[in-house]
């Protein structure tokens, strides 16, 4: 469930899962504890690796570590995927968190995330069976449930970053402080394997970006939270301390899993424990030392060592001589009763164990690491009425409610209904629209069409009369009314910060576009901030975008919130409406390039206003290497993934509707109202099946103190 970017999880349940371990350690002390733990674990893994090498099992040692690590490695970076939200688009600390996340996903490249690098390592270790997406990994029966405990909770917390934002910053602080997990570091030190582990070091920057100290960035963000006071600091410390405890438990299990390669006894114990449940069904009548083998196998599901002890004394085994042992010779031959019960890898484990048995009394086994118990909270059976969320009654209310990220069930229904109504109007508009995508998709079709549209935009600008300039009042009013839209620039792509989408062939350019809109971690390049500076130049000082005061500002028309609400809804439904988002994104990125941005520049310069915003967009949205080109590439990547002509036709039509949805032509009723001088803004709202109210808004708290002080709580 937590892998779904559109899911909603109960914050109270997640809060119980985090638990309360008493007084948390302060960051300086916790940092020293992490350093000491890493040294201790480095020594432990070095001993285990040496034992594995002595048994000629270096590769098996690395494989055991990699297999258990797969669930966690598959979601690296996920704890930050839900932090960015429209209401905090201008918060400098949020921009730095997005910078950290960009390094984690390998912004600008497909399949360049830390998780994808781990999958490449799995290939080197001949473990491609495990090189899967997280949802597929969860279906593999041979992966222990406890391997999913930490990654599952990290995913779940990320879906409620409105409630756990400070805790997640603490989680990030601790993970960057650890850097490279000790078990993974041990994999990189094995001779003869040449495994490159640098990309798994969470403190290391992505080579495709400017060098940066991710640890220092995370520490800077943590300091901004500490400045907010004791309550926020306590939540930060809770997240950091919880993560360190959870990571120690995960690491102990990882270490214990690696011991299978350090000793034939450990490997055999693991094998018997894995196969015991199935075997218990078939051996009721076979006795070993007067007891049914089925009963021995039943006990072995929890403790396999007693079974190994009696098995070593049975007639099935000749200690020190696997070639004469019935268990791995006649019983598993084509005519034997256990033919094909064991895989070839299983048989190798059994043979090594048999040959090793004479040394059992003189060989010291590496001890397993103890695992601290962690109480799990019970899942709530019902949700309170307050948890159902809001069904906004006006566009202004919808704009305010949707400034967060998570959507409660009722609000989710509203968002789905709003988008569906908008798209239905766009579908009707498409029948007569003159600004359509080609009727059919094909390779190279979209890029050629894109260049043609760019030429048309440029020609329209060249043909325009430079002397025809709107009045200063018109320019100022237009800039003001665009504020609800432009101050959430990129909101339609919000869902593509999901770690899986952000690094996919379809989504990587969309995430890069989103990251560009927010300034690439640099406050001075943040598009909403640049636009707000332009508003100040025109003597408009607007409230923070995420505040109720902004949504209720009487200077802003109700009509000015229609398209922004569509963007806000669309961005929270990246899976349900992916084709439409792809089409709308292309329409948006292409809308001003070559033409209207140049016209806007002319008008703004004429009256002495800054042209920074339109200048920036006219360059980064270009059709060759900019956002418009990336938008077309994302569509092509999506269409190439489809496998049948029917799918191509259906999905392309959805993309075309999405393109039209940026500016669908008004219907007859809307046109009539406009001729009468009446507003139709409220008419776009879907009507609820029943009234729904909630006292809570799932908004994100600003991290930077200056931003927090500017924000007015509802």
PLM-predicted stretches and their roles:
Residues 206-266, 620-711:
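Acidic, carboxylate-rich catalytic segments that either coordinate divalent cations
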Residues 1, 382-400, 693-714:
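Terminal accessory/targeting
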């Amino acid at each position: 469930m937590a892998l779904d970017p559109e899911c909603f999880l109960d914050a109270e349940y997640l809060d119980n899962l985090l638990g309360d371990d008493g007084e948390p350690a302060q960051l300086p002390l916790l940092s020293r504890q992490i350093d000491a733990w890493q040294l201790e674990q480095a020594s432990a893994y070095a001993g285990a690796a040496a034992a594995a090498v002595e048994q000629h099992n270096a590769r098996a040692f690395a494989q055991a570590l990699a297999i258990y690590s797969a669930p966690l490695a598959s979601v690296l970076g996920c704890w930050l995927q839900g932090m960015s939200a429209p209401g905090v688009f201008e918060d400098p600390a949020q921009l730095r968190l997005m910078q950290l996340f960009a390094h984690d996903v390998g912004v600008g490249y497909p399949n360049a995330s830390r998780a994808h690098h781990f999958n490449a390592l799995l290939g080197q270790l001949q473990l491609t069976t495990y090189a899967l997406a997280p949802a597929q990994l969860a279906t593999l029966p041979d992966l222990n449930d406890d391997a999913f405990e930490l990654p599952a909770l990290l995913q779940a917390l990320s879906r409620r970053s409105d409630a756990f934002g400070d805790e997640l910053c603490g989680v990030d602080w601790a993970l960057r402080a650890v850097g490279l997990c000790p078990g993974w570091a041990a994999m990189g030190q094995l001779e003869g394997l040449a495994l490159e582990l640098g990309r798994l070091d969470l403190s290391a920057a992505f080579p495709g970006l400017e060098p940066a100290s991710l640890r220092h960035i995370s520490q800077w963000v943590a300091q901004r939270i500490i400045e907010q006071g004791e309550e926020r600091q306590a939540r930060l410390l809770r997240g950091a301390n919880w993560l360190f405890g959870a990571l120690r438990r995960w690491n102990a299990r990882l270490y214990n899993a690696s011991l299978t390669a350090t000793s034939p006894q450990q490997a055999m114990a693991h094998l018997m424990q894995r196969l015991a449940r199935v075997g218990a069904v078939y051996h009721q009548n076979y006795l070993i030392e007067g007891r049914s083998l089925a009963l021995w196998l039943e006990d072995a599901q929890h403790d396999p060592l007693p079974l190994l002890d009696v098995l070593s004394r049975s007639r099935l085994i000749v200690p020190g001589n696997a070639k004469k042992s019935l268990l791995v010779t006649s019983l598993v031959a084509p005519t034997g009763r256990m033919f094909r019960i064991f895989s070839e890898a299983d048989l190798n484990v059994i043979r090594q164990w048999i040959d090793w048995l004479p040394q059992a009394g003189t060989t010291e086994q590496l001890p397993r690491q103890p695992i601290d118990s962690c109480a799990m909270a019970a899942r709530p059976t019902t949700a309170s009425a307050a948890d159902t969320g809001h069904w906004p009654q006006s566009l202004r209310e919808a704009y305010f409610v949707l400034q967060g990220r998570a959507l409660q069930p009722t609000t989710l229904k509203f968002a789905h209904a709003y988008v569906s109504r908008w798209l239905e109007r766009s579908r009707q508009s498409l029948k007569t629209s003159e600004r359509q995508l080609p009727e059919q998709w094909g390779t190279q079709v979209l890029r050629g069409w894109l260049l043609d549209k760019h030429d048309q935009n440029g020609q329209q600008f060249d043909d325009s009369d430079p002397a025809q300039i709107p009045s200063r009042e018109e320019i100022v009013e237009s800039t003001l009314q665009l504020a609800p839209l432009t101050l959430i620039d990129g909101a339609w792509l919000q869902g593509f910060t999901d770690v899986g989408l952000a690094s996919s062939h379809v989504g990587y350019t969309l995430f890069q576009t989103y990251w560009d809109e927010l300034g690439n971690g640099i406050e001075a390049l943040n598009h909403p901030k640049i636009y707000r500076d332009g508003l100040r130049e025109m003597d408009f000082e607007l409230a923070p975008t995420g505040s109720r005061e902004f949504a209720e500002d009487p200077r802003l028309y109700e009509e000015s919130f229609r398209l922004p609400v569509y963007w806000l809804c669309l961005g929270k439904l990246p899976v349900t409406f992916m084709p439409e988002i792809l089409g709308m994104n292309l329409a948006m990125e292409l809308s001003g390039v070559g033409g209207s941005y140049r016209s806007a520049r002319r008008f703004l310069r004429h009256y002495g206003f800054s042209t920074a915003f339109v200048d920036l967009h006219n360059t980064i949205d270009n059709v060759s290497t900019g956002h418009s080109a990336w938008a077309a590439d994302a569509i092509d990547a999506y269409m190439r993934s489809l496998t049948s002509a029917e799918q191509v036709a259906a999905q392309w039509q959805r993309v075309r509707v999405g393109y039209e949805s940026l500016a669908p032509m008004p219907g007859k009723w809307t046109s009539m109202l406009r001729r009468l001088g009446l507003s139709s803004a409220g008419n776009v709202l879907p009507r609820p099946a029943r009234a729904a109210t909630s006292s809570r808004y799932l908004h994100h708290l600003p991290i930077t103190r200056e931003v927090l002080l500017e924000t007015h709580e509802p």
